[in-house]
UniProtKB/Swiss-Prot annotation:
The lineage of its organism: Eukaryota, Metazoa, Chordata, Craniata, Vertebrata. The keyword Acetylation applies. Belongs to the actin family. It comes from the Eukaryota. In vertebrates 3 main groups of actin isoforms, alpha, beta and gamma have been identified. The alpha actins are found in muscle tissues and are a major constituent of the contractile apparatus. The beta and gamma actins coexist in most cell types as components of the cytoskeleton and as mediators of internal cell motility. It is found in: Cytoplasm, Cytoskeleton. Polymerization of globular actin (G-actin) leads to a structural filament (F-actin) in the form of a two-stranded helix. Each actin can bind to 4 others. This is Actin, alpha skeletal muscle. The modification Methionine (R)-sulfoxide is found at M46, M49. Actins are highly conserved proteins that are involved in various types of cell motility and are ubiquitously expressed in all eukaryotic cells. Oxidation of Met-46 and Met-49 by MICALs (MICAL1, MICAL2 or MICAL3) to form methionine sulfoxide promotes actin filament depolymerization. MICAL1 and MICAL2 produce the (R)-S-oxide form. The (R)-S-oxide form is reverted by MSRB1 and MSRB2, which promotes actin repolymerization.
Length: 377
């Protein structure tokens, strides 16, 4: 099926923060752009400028100074379908430059998403974009495919949602899935807040993007939070400077590790929830006693929010403290984990055994959107 570019399947990982899209069988996504739709805040005065009423992705990012930026996907759930359609349209026609009606399309979603969300996704794919076939896969399961395992527990932390999914011999264990609506975007908001304490004010949607960049470039996870706070208070060795787009230079110190510490202590942002190390442990404890050993030995990290330096060591330390003392614990943090969901999708969609799993246009016409629950796990 994948010999020719004509009928290659498309893989589109719609994250809350980034869309990763490309062709099945490739080893990396061709298009990676922010899931943003921007609309002008001001009246257009120059005629013939070809101004649009909305901008998508990188174009919205580059004109962000005059736009209001909105993310149509919040916490992994699509909240604005009109904007989402714009993003898909942009993905197919501008980024990949393909006609969706010629390619089967694999989409991804977070586990424990509302059922209506997948149905509407299915409906738009078949009715608006006329795809010949489609499938909706769970993100964390794809990450496991990408790491070459069939057993393990995935911690998938993106921009909108973090979840732990234990998979045993290729089966996800739905009763043990843990979902935490705390992820990259919440960390960005928290960083905006604690930078205000230093006297740097960031308020607009465009300035939030600057803070996101600061977060991605300078934040790290401390192995021991209290010690690190003491070090930061007594010396300036942890301080780093960052140049804003207008040339101002700001200095940040303990904010560098206070921001991602929220993942381990959600009470920092007022969330009454266990940290990611505890949800991972709780998820393993909900699984059958016989398979826990294999899960402890295969903790796979995936998603952009697991890209902080030091996060793997910290997870190792925290889970070791919770688990039985004789247990062997291994955290797997592949360097390409930012895209591992997409890579897993690319692997899945190009398997010969997967070809009968697609939902075809014909099946959709017969059964309607609810077919997605029967055919996609």
């Amino acid at each position: 099926m994948c010999d020719d570019e004509e009928t290659t399947a498309l893989v589109c990982d719609n994250g809350s923060g980034l869309v990763k899209a490309g062709f099945a069988g490739d080893d990396a996504p061709r298009a990676v752009f922010p899931s943003i739709v921007g609309r002008p805040r001001h009246q257009g005065v120059m005629v013939g400028m070809g101004q649009k009423d909305s901008y998508v992705g990188d174009e919205a990012q580059s004109k962000r100074g005059i736009l209001t930026l909105k993310y149509p996907i919040e916490h992994g759930i699509i909240t604005n379908w009109d904007d989402m359609e714009k993003i898909w349209h942009h993905t197919f026609y501008n980024e990949l430059r393909v006609a969706p009606e010629e390619h089967p399309t694999l989409l991804t979603e977070a586990p424990l998403n509302p059922k209506a969300n997948r149905e509407k996704m299915t409906q738009i794919m078949f009715e608006t974009f006329n795809v010949p076939a489609m499938y909706v896969a769970i993100q964390a399961v794809l990450s496991l495919y990408a790491s070459g395992r069939t057993t393990g527990i995935v911690l998938d932390a993106g921009d909108g949602v973090t979840h732990n999914v234990p998979v045993y011999e290729g089966y996800a264990l739905p009763h043990a899935i843990m979902r935490l609506d705390l992820a990259g975007r919440d960390l960005t908001d928290y960083l905006m807040k604690i930078l205000t304490e230093r006297g740097y004010s960031f308020v607009t949607t465009a300035e939030r993007e600057i803070v996101r960049d600061i977060k991605e470039k300078l934040c790290y996870v401390a192995l021991d939070f209290e010690n690190e706070m003491a070090t930061a208070a007594s010396s300036s060795s942890l301080e780093k400077s960052y140049e804003l787009p207008d040339g101002q230079v700001i200095t940040i110190g303990n904010e560098r590790f206070r921001c991602p510490e929220t993942l381990f202590q959600p009470s920092f942002i007022g969330m009454e929830s266990a940290g990611i190390h505890e949800t991972a442990y709780n998820s393993i404890m909900k699984c059958d006693i016989d398979i826990r050993k294999d899960l402890y030995a295969n903790n796979v990290l995936s998603g952009g929010t697991t890209m902080y330096p030091g996060i793997a060591d910290r997870m190792q330390k925290e889970i070791t403290a919770l688990a039985p003392s004789t247990m062997k614990i291994k955290i797997i943090a592949p360097p390409e984990r930012k895209y591992s969901v997409w890579i897993g999708g690319s692997i899945l969609a190009s398997l010969s055994t997967f070809q009968q799993m697609w939902i075809s246009k014909q099946e959709y016409d017969e059964a309607g959107p609810s077919i997605v629950h029967r055919k996609c796990f």
